[in-house]
Design a protein with these regions (language model features):
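Membrane-interfacial, low-structure loops and terminal tails that flank and connect transmembrane helices
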Residues: 3-32, 208-225
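N-terminal signal-anchor transmembrane alpha helix
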Residues: 36-76, 234-246
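Small-polar-interrupted transmembrane alpha-helices in polytopic inner-membrane proteins
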Residues: 42, 46-53, 149-169, 230-238, ...
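Interfacial helix-loop-helix junctions of multi-pass membrane proteins
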Residues: 57-68, 162-185, 245-255, 331-355
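Individual transmembrane alpha-helix segments
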Residues: 90-128, 278-297
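Hydrophobic cores of alpha-helical transmembrane segments in multi-pass inner/ER membrane proteins
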Residues: 126-132, 190-207, 296-303, 354-367
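Membrane-interface helix-loop-helix junctions at transmembrane boundaries of multi-pass membrane enzymes
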Residues: 139-153, 305-323
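Membrane-interfacial catalytic/cofactor-binding modules of polytopic membrane enzymes
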Residues: 240-296, 302, 306
Length: 367
């Protein structure tokens, strides 16, 4: 009996411990995370540049200089005097030329044409960079598990942006419109920042292992994450309001600060019927709302920064300090815009970028 018991214990002790089964994150394909991250960084930089070029296109009144949408053949600019005259003749048919720029010379037309052509050409290059990267990584089977849909989604947003761009331009080619519709301009700019935001988010996600991201989500400061995300959303609303200001040239109506002319409120802000249209079409009221949201955004950002400036994590403190510094810069640029009729789309890009960093760092305390 003793021998039999001894044999049983010997058998149990001799059995090796089973290896732990790998989790889903460990089993998932890693792919070329670093290469894909670098590729998205290039796209991010190009989208930021395109926002800046789009701002200059708007400021120089160049957006309606090309009256047709030719995604492929339009990549070749006029190469002869006859081709230039043909393009100029098309521009002469739209209200902007007939009511505002009548008498413009061919050389002056070339100046605005190159801005719009460059803006569209940059969009084509971004699409080409995305397509080459996506299908190249896909063919090489280097896309990490779970990332094919995300990258395809990013490209889909880019294609949609091109269509919305033409939808915006077409609004200024008929009737008595001298510029594109401000609603469509806001939609176009808003989607550009959405693309920029997703690209930034993907860049930060790809910079860390999936297991690290999971651990960071579990230990993150959800309250700080929620506040900074709310700040990012408020900044996005402010960008849309800025597009409305640019769309109807509301900034030129009251080039003074801190007052709107001689008073705090703009005179006669509700002259358009129905009432709600004043918030989108009355130059004084649109600029006033833009200013008030700017003040609220700065105060809210200052409160969040004050609470996060002594956090235990150095990366988080740095991110919030950078965000607050950019907000201070944006306030100064906003005041200069009101006084000197200048705009800065690139500073808005930096603003949203820093806010995105804050959202990520506040969630991932172990960054």
């Amino acid at each position: 009996m003793a021998d039999k018991q001894r044999a049983i214990f010997q058998d149990v002790e001799s059995q090796a411990k089973p290896a732990a089964a790998p989790g889903g994150i460990d089993r998932a394909g890693k792919g070329a995370r670093g290469a894909i991250r670098a590729w998205i960084m290039v796209i991010f930089a190009m989208v930021a540049l395109m926002i800046a070029v789009g701002g200059m296109t708007r400021l120089t009144d160049s957006g309606l200089s090309i009256t047709e949408w030719k995604p492929v053949t339009g990549s070749v600019p006029p190469l002869s005097e006859e081709a230039w005259m043909a393009e100029f003749e098309k521009y002469r048919q739209i209200p902007e030329y007939q009511l505002q720029n009548k008498g413009m010379s061919l050389e002056e037309f070339k100046g605005i044409y190159w801005w719009e052509w460059g803006h569209r050409q940059l969009g084509r290059v971004i699409g080409l960079v995305w397509a080459l990267g996506f299908f190249g990584f896909l063919a090489a089977r280097k896309i990490p598990t779970g990332w094919t849909g995300r990258l395809l989604f990013l490209g889909g947003l880019g294609g949609l942006q091109g269509a919305i761009g033409w939808w915006m331009v077409s609004s200024g080619l008929g009737g008595e419109m001298l510029d594109v519709a401000s609603y469509r301009l806001a939609t176009h700019l808003g989607l550009a920042f959405i693309i920029l935001g997703f690209a930034a988010w993907y860049i930060f996600l790809l910079g860390r292992r999936e297991a690290d991201l999971m651990q960071a989500r579990r230990s993150g400061d959800t309250r700080l994450f929620g506040r900074s995300t709310g700040l990012m959303h408020l900044a996005f609303i402010q960008i849309l309001l800025g597009a409305l200001v640019a769309g109807i040239d509301a900034g030129r109506a009251f080039p003074t600060w801190p007052l709107m002319g001689d008073s705090f409120l703009p005179p006669d802000p509700f002259t358009i019927t129905p009432l709600w249209r004043n918030f989108f079409e009355d130059a004084g009221l649109v600029q006033f709302v833009h200013r008030m949201v700017a003040y609220a955004l700065f105060l809210y950002g200052a409160v969040i920064w004050w609470g996060a400036r002594r956090g235990p994590n150095g990366h988080t403190r740095f991110a919030f300090n950078a965000m607050f510094a950019v907000m201070l810069l944006q306030v100064i640029l906003g005041i200069m815009t009101a006084i000197k009729s200048k705009h800065s789309f690139s500073s808005c890009a930096m603003n949203v970028f820093c806010l995105s960093i804050c959202s990520i760092f506040s969630q991932n305390q172990n960054v």
